[in-house]
Amino acid sequence: MAVFFGGLAYGINNFKLYDLYKAYFVKSSFIEENYVEPKETKLIFPEKKRNVIYIYLESMENSYMSKDLGGMEEVNLIPKLTQLANEGYSFSDTDNKFVGPKTPVGSQWSLASMTNQMTGLPMKVPGDNNTYGSSGNFFPGAWTFGDVLNNEGYEQTVMVGANAKFGGLEYLFSSHGNYKVMDYNFAIENGFLPNNYKQFWGFEDDKLYKFAKDEITRLYNTGKPFNMTLETADTHMPGYVSPQIENVFNNQYANAIYYSQNEVYKFVQWIKQQPFYDNTTIILIGDHLSMCSDFFKNVNKNYNRTQYNLIINPSPELEISKTCFNNRIWSNYDMYPTVLAAMGVKIDGNRLALGTNLFSNEPTVFERYGYDYVNKELAKKVSDEVDGFLKELSRSEIISKSLDNYGYILLVDNIDEAG
């Protein structure tokens, strides 16, 4: 799972010297000028609040489709996800339905992607270690997707097959929304697995879906609206070889992708058979682009690789612009208001943080200013003028110092070491 190991190394190793210089010394007030405070934005939930099942699919790309669908493969590696895409809503930056979001600064690994979609903000890589934040101190001033739902009485669980403490994922979800965090350690401690059990990063996706079915059933039986968030792992490079996997292709990663997409499909079909489905919206999104460089070594460098994205069974009350799906320049930030809108939430102004409700006619920040310009601004250090904004956002002196060091990222455990 890239959030825990490979993604961090990838982020640091690909952080070029000039980018590092910009992050520390070249200033920008872009966030200050374009940030919409979610906590101050009027949100109207439907009388019957919808459940949401939010699935981050490790390294899942549209590029895995066949060339006739706009992918890079001779044979479609994700036929079941392609089938599902015809049942729901996807957003594309071309006329082709199967082209997803841009990948701006601070969104290239799993934890960053989750943070983007939860907060509507980018995330930068600190230089100290794998500890992003601490309990109660992960973006402490941000009002996130999880905070919004928690404030509306939702029961929330996040489930991952790895150790959620590594990288700070646990802190993101426990600090914002009072999520129940079910990870590898939780599974061992609660007898879901033998004490010595370890596959890949912790436990494999076959077990993730099994445990998730039980937890979703428990959430439904509370009688409260619920949010079940999952992060898969089997398609992290080099690809986990499940005992049930079929060797359809002469490539381990291709087989892992093919097997994974089929398991996702079966899980979605299970959800559709449950009594809560009519009032439940499903989100499927690739967390980031794959880091398995060998798998893409023969791909044209100009090919536009993008994350798979799909919204299934949105609220019947959702207002949809006829022109909202194609030729959109968007990113993970936009998922924050877009998912809420899919759940039937009315958002005053259709914007939260740096994100835009993609179902609306409101332009994203990238559409308004241009992708290259926005990406360059987000790579810079925050300006001195934004100091008051940051203090209000963070509500603590120490996070303001961390933000000053890294530019709007988050609190790390040791500010002196981080700086």
Regions found by a protein language model. Name each.
Residues M1-K22:
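Transmembrane and membrane-interface helices of multi-pass
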Residues N14, V26, I31, Q273, ...:
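A general marker of short, structured functional hotspots
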Residues P38-R50, Y54-G419:
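Solvent-exposed soluble domains appended to multi-pass membrane proteins
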Residues Y21-P38:
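Short extracytoplasmic/periplasmic juxtamembrane "stem" segments immediately C-terminal to an N-terminal membrane anchor
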